[in-house]
Amino acid sequence: MTNRLSYRRRGRAALATAVVAAAATAAGLLAAAGCSSSSPATNPLTGQGSGGHVLAAKIDNVGAAQTQLSGLNSADLVYVIQVEGGLSRYLAVFDSSTAPDVRVGPLRSARQTDIPLLAPFGRVGLAYTGAISGLLPELAAANLQNITPAVAPKLFSNGGSSPTYLQTSAVFSAYPNLAETQNVGFQFGAAPDGGQPAASAAAQLPGASFAFTASGQKWLVSVDGRAATSSGQGRLSADNVIIQHVHVVAGKFTDHNAGHADNEVFSQTTGSGQADFYRGGQVWHGQWSKAGDTSPTDYTVGGATMLLAPGRTWIVLEGS
């Protein structure tokens, strides 16, 4: 993928206009009245530690960004999502207990897929640099606290032609009423019977390949055949890997940023499909189902709930 294709969307930040800023400010005031004062005793996103307030961040993973990643090994969850032009992005989910003060980035633009994907989490923060103009009203109307350079410029570092980052501590301080970790469908426990030995897992998106190599109880992440790392954190790793097979369809919007039309795509995470579950050097083949946008996702094998290993989970939304 050329540098032009990899980086031509930095201009999206300018599109995060006052329509999102005004809605985000009003929504933040409303959220303060409905947020609980105590965190879950056990984090329902990881099955370990205590829960906290939730921040999701849209993160670049193309070209030079692969050597600029920061904070991913502090995430509770990392989603890999296809976007236009065959590219992909990470949607990383952090909580204030697990990642109280972590540098996160490089940040990129929000997409249509993010809204229903995050709907079960409640009114969490979504940090991104901008969005295509047609999507801005939907982001403003969504049950999300939009956090962008247009809304809160002091929370972001660099920007423009340079990678954009934020510090989780600054976000949690500025937005103390973000929704706390809650059940979005993950269940944790001892590995179920029926797993098959697996030394690695692989997923293919149009513009990138992802591999996860078993190393003890962990899975080490590689992208396009190269070891993936996070600044100051070493090799990217997961305790669980889910390859979630979804329908990827044409999105509602067309991007005209680089002088030509580029159709956005939408990964359907409401519905059902096949899923492959990797934990502890084994694989199980099963299903996922989600009744509605705000419903938890059920992960099953042979009709029984698939139990994950406590820890961080990577979920690749692979087109079926």
Regions found by a protein language model. Give the residues of each.
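C-terminal region of N-terminal signal peptides and the immediate post-cleavage residues
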Residues: 27-48
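N-terminal export and membrane-targeting signals
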Residues: 2-23
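A surface/extracellular/periplasmic glyco- and lipid-processing/surface-interacting theme
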Residues: 41-77, 84-320
